[in-house]
Every structure is written in C-alpha cells, then in structure tokens.
Amino acid sequence: MRLDLYVITDGAIGGGRSHAEIARFACAGGADAIQLRDKACGPDALCRIGREIRAITRDTGTLFIVNDRLDVALACGADGVHLGQGDLRVDTARRLAPRPFMIGVSVGNAEEAISAVVAGADYVAASPIFATSSKDDAGPGCGISGLREIRAAVAVPVVAIGGITRDNVAEVIAGGADSIAVISAVVGQPDIVAAARDLRERITTAKEQYREKRDA
C-alpha cells in the first residue's frame, strides 16, 4: 500500500467547498488517502458525506478514513477509522472492526505509539510535528526528534502531521515519516489539485533522496 500523501478534509478552510469537493480535488491531485474530519457534524449528516466521499475514493482507488467515528466509518463503508488519544479505545475498535479494516491512532511520543500498536493499530500518526493552527487540540509539536523516536519504536507505518508545508516536507521525510498528512497545505490552497500534486511530487522526490543517502 502506497501512502505518501494523506489529505484531511476541513470545510472551515476549504474556501466554501464541501468535504466531497475537497476530496474530489485532492484525489485528482494524487492523494493516496482522504480522511473525513468534521467535529461539529452529526452522525447522520456525516454518514451522508461519508458515502459521497466513499464513491469518489472508490473510483480513484484512494484510501478513505473517517476521523473519530467508528460507527460512521462502518456505516459508509470506509476503509478505516482514525482515533485520537481521547477517543474510543483501540482494542475496543479492533474487536468491533477486524482487519482488513484499518485503525490509525494519533500519538505524541514513542510510548503512546507502542501502546497503540500493541492494542491493534495499523498505523500511527505522529502529531503534531510542528505547531499548527488547523487543529485546536493538537498541542505543542514533538519536532523531528520526536518523530525519529516514534519511528524507531514501532514497525507500522508512521504518518506525520502538523505544520507540514511544501517547504519542510523533505525534512520530515528524512526524519522517518512514511506518509505526510496535511490540512491547510492542500485544503486551504486556492487550487487544491495543484497543491496536492506539488506536495506529492515533493514527497516522492524526498523519499528517493532519502533512500539514496541511506544506501550510499
């Protein structure tokens, strides 16, 4: 599974575009995964949005994840759910949704990453790497050093999120991230397709350079 660019929807900064429109544009720009995130939306409305995005991502072969709500993820046929530290317990979610359904977990340090994997997480999201205004509850950044510690602690894919832009993405890849998750760097841009395409190209280039340096 290739998971370079992971785009999280956010209607508040999407320039009036719906979650489905954001997802469609991000997929057109080469996003490997779309996460539906809307803290204010009720479950029924979120399911309707989720089904729209599921149709889009099914056509493009893009992974579809729902933030927080396992019930919504299962109801709309998503590929997985992403859980925070204060959400449903990972082991409970895993009992309710066996693999191949995916479970991702936000972690702020190596200890949380190890606990998440032991409980059944398929990937962990090191969050936030840098300070960010896109998520009010993100907390202080763990930095590249924190990312390296998380990468060294677990064998599952590590997604990096928080304050990542086209200008610092190479540094984050060099720090050990398998995937880059963004909100404002894609969703908050005037041209989502172009922003996603540019960022994915930069991720690909950074990974190639990192492999060459590592193997030299």
From Swiss-Prot:
<dbReference type="InterPro" id="IPR013785">
    <property type="entry name" value="Aldolase_TIM"/>
</dbReference>
<feature type="binding site">
    <location>
        <position position="68"/>
    </location>
    <ligand>
        <name>Mg(2+)</name>
    </ligand>
</feature>
<keyword id="KW-0808">Transferase</keyword>
<keyword id="KW-0479">Metal-binding</keyword>
<feature type="binding site">
    <location>
        <begin position="35"/>
        <end position="39"/>
    </location>
    <ligand>
        <name>4-amino-2-methyl-5-(diphosphooxymethyl)pyrimidine</name>
    </ligand>
</feature>
<feature type="binding site">
    <location>
        <begin position="183"/>
        <end position="184"/>
    </location>
    <ligand>
        <name>2-[(2R,5Z)-2-carboxy-4-methylthiazol-5(2H)-ylidene]ethyl phosphate</name>
    </ligand>
</feature>
<feature type="binding site">
    <location>
        <position position="106"/>
    </location>
    <ligand>
        <name>4-amino-2-methyl-5-(diphosphooxymethyl)pyrimidine</name>
    </ligand>
</feature>
<comment type="function">
    <text>Condenses 4-methyl-5-(beta-hydroxyethyl)thiazole monophosphate (THZ-P) and 2-methyl-4-amino-5-hydroxymethyl pyrimidine pyrophosphate (HMP-PP) to form thiamine monophosphate (TMP).</text>
</comment>
<keyword id="KW-0784">Thiamine biosynthesis</keyword>
<comment type="pathway">
    <text>Cofactor biosynthesis; thiamine diphosphate biosynthesis; thiamine phosphate from 4-amino-2-methyl-5-diphosphomethylpyrimidine and 4-methyl-5-(2-phosphoethyl)-thiazole: step 1/1.</text>
</comment>
<dbReference type="Pfam" id="PF02581">
    <property type="entry name" value="TMP-TENI"/>
</dbReference>
<comment type="similarity">
    <text>Belongs to the thiamine-phosphate synthase family.</text>
</comment>
<dbReference type="InterPro" id="IPR034291">
    <property type="entry name" value="TMP_synthase"/>
</dbReference>
<dbReference type="InterPro" id="IPR022998">
    <property type="entry name" value="ThiamineP_synth_TenI"/>
</dbReference>
<dbReference type="GO" id="GO:0004789">
    <property type="term" value="F:thiamine-phosphate diphosphorylase activity"/>
</dbReference>
<dbReference type="GO" id="GO:0009229">
    <property type="term" value="P:thiamine diphosphate biosynthetic process"/>
</dbReference>
<dbReference type="GO" id="GO:0009228">
    <property type="term" value="P:thiamine biosynthetic process"/>
</dbReference>
<feature type="binding site">
    <location>
        <position position="87"/>
    </location>
    <ligand>
        <name>Mg(2+)</name>
    </ligand>
</feature>
<dbReference type="InterPro" id="IPR036206">
    <property type="entry name" value="ThiamineP_synth_sf"/>
</dbReference>
<feature type="binding site">
    <location>
        <position position="163"/>
    </location>
    <ligand>
        <name>2-[(2R,5Z)-2-carboxy-4-methylthiazol-5(2H)-ylidene]ethyl phosphate</name>
    </ligand>
</feature>
<dbReference type="GO" id="GO:0005737">
    <property type="term" value="C:cytoplasm"/>
</dbReference>
<feature type="binding site">
    <location>
        <begin position="132"/>
        <end position="134"/>
    </location>
    <ligand>
        <name>2-[(2R,5Z)-2-carboxy-4-methylthiazol-5(2H)-ylidene]ethyl phosphate</name>
    </ligand>
</feature>
<feature type="binding site">
    <location>
        <position position="135"/>
    </location>
    <ligand>
        <name>4-amino-2-methyl-5-(diphosphooxymethyl)pyrimidine</name>
    </ligand>
</feature>
<protein>
    <recommendedName>
        <fullName>Thiamine-phosphate synthase</fullName>
        <ecNumber>2.5.1.3</ecNumber>
    </recommendedName>
</protein>
<dbReference type="GO" id="GO:0000287">
    <property type="term" value="F:magnesium ion binding"/>
</dbReference>
<keyword id="KW-0460">Magnesium</keyword>
<feature type="binding site">
    <location>
        <position position="67"/>
    </location>
    <ligand>
        <name>4-amino-2-methyl-5-(diphosphooxymethyl)pyrimidine</name>
    </ligand>
</feature>
